[in-house]
Design a protein with these regions (language model features):
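Second-shell loop/turn segments in exported
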Residues: 24, 39-52, 79-83, 114-124, ...
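Cleavable N-terminal signal peptides of Sec/SRP-targeted secreted and luminal proteins
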Residues: 5-24, 382-396
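C-terminal GPI-anchoring signal of eukaryotic secretory precursors
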Residues: 365-386
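Acidic/histidine-rich catalytic neighborhood of metal-dependent amide-processing enzymes
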Residues: 114-248
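Active-site-adjacent substrate-binding region
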Residues: 195, 202-368
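A non-catalytic alpha/beta surface segment that caps or lines the substrate-entry region
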Residues: 32-99, 273
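N-terminal capping segment at the start of a domain
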Residues: 20-55, 59, 65, 112-113, ...
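Structural recognition of the beta-strand scaffold that forms the well-ordered cores
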Residues: 71, 93, 104-108, 154-157, ...
């Protein structure tokens, strides 16, 4: 292995250490999550047990982390073999109750798949990232952590994203969750909701020119983003942050952006904001780029005659609008899927989400309080120190 590759490996390992547990353990944990998500998870897929197995795994992980697990059941319709079929779905919810009573914050990802999609790209990596954020958040705010849980955080694995199923007209699991579980849980009060962070297709990075497709009229909806992407040769070298330009969304967007950029180093994946302003209608081609993920059901929530838009941001690689530079033909193992570039990208995304939760929903313990950090549960390792250690190790090597 070359010195450059050694350096990148060490930088990555140390970067992951800042997420909360030892770097090797984080890499192992992410791979372990993805190994449970390598199969197509569709109600009429080749393996009828794959979706149930993934659901059971998510529940087990939530329980191990110390989250209070709830299950929200619903029914919807799925188009299959020329007819609409009614199917049952389960949204899996893990609740970390806060003591301070502030507005709750949500992190979510779809855990099912369409029949013709890559199960790790869409959306196994998103589920794995959500699980890692949940694991590290609970460790950071647990007995050995340096934070206390002030406001509630909930982690949600959504089932049956029918908007990605060809020809299906049934409402997806995220829609039913917002209407049937979340809104009653909030006592129908927008003031009790800090927002949602949705992870949907986050692993495709491509540094090649013309690897990023932009829909017609994309430039009208997102002029600054269009200019940046075009001038950069239409490269798929960014993580897109899709949000609405409302005051309710601003704090969530700014907190995540600050945490992401603070931990991003040269060469790592940049962040591209796509802000949908209420006074600037988005054309249908561009809207179709951002309306099939779970966040959209928060934006369009309408419990009565009046629209009650809930703040939510989407983190995405833009899904099928981007060509992957690291194909992993099916069946694709978790080990083969987790290339160096994907590890870097997923680590940065997890870190940004984790520190957003800690900033918004937790409080750092004061000196002398119980809960001093142990080596296995620390999120206090500074990134400056880890990068320095990586550089020194590379030189010594």
């Amino acid at each position: 292995m070359t010195l450059l590759n050694n350096t990148w490996t060490l930088l990555l390992l140390c970067f992951l250490a800042g997420l909360g547990l030892s770097a090797g353990q984080d890499i192992h944990q992410m791979q372990y999550h993805l190994e449970k998500l390598t199969s197509v998870r569709h109600p009429f897929g080749a393996d009828p047990n794959a979706r149930e197995a993934a659901r059971s795994y998510i529940k087990e992980q939530f329980q191990q982390y110390g989250l209070e697990v709830a299950v929200h059941t619903f029914s919807t319709t799925v188009w299959h073999q020329g007819q609409q079929r009614t199917v049952a779905g389960e949204n899996v919810i893990g609740v970390s109750e806060g003591a301070g009573g502030g507005p709750l914050l949500l992190v979510g990802a779809d855990y099912d798949t369409a029949l013709n999609r890559h199960p790790l790209e869409d959306n196994g990596a998103g589920v794995g990232a959500m699980l890692e954020v949940a694991r590290n958040y609970m460790a950071a705010t647990g007995p050995d952590g340096v934070f206390t849980r002030n406001s509630t955080v909930i982690f949600v694995a959504f089932d049956l994203n029918t908007l990605e199923y060809d020809g299906s007209t049934g409402e997806p699991g995220a829609y039913h969750f917002v209407h049937q579980w979340l809104w009653p849980h909030l006592n129908q009060s927008l003031l009790k909701f800090a927002g949602a962070i949705i992870l949907d297709s986050i692993s495709k990075i491509n540094m090649d020119q013309n690897s990023q497709y932009l829909p017609q009229d994309f430039g009208k909806a997102f002029p600054s983003a269009y200019k940046r992407i075009s001038e950069d040769g239409n490269k798929g070298d960014f993580l897109a942050l899709v949000t609405r330009g409302t005051s309710q969304s601003k704090r969530l967007k700014d907190t995540f952006t600050g945490n992401y950029l603070k931990r991003r180093k040269a060469g790592l994946i940049r962040l591209q904001e796509l802000v949908v302003h209420t006074n600037s209608p988005v054309s249908i081609p561009t809207l179709e780029m951002i309306n099939h993920q779970a966040h959209y059901h928060f934006w369009t929530f309408q419990p009565s005659d009046q629209l009650t838009a809930l703040p939510a941001l989407l983190l995405t690689d833009t899904d099928f609008y981007r060509k992957s530079s690291e194909e992993c033909p099916l069946p694709c193992s978790a080990e083969a899927f987790l290339t160096r570039q994907r590890k870097q990208s997923l680590a940065l995304t997890c870190s940004g989400v984790l520190y957003t939760l800690l900033d918004m929903q937790a409080e750092r313990r004061r000196p002398g309080e119980t809960g001093e950090v142990t080596s296995g549960a620390s999120v206090g390792v500074t990134l400056a120190m880890t990068w320095l250690l990586a550089a020194v190790a590379a030189i010594l090597h």
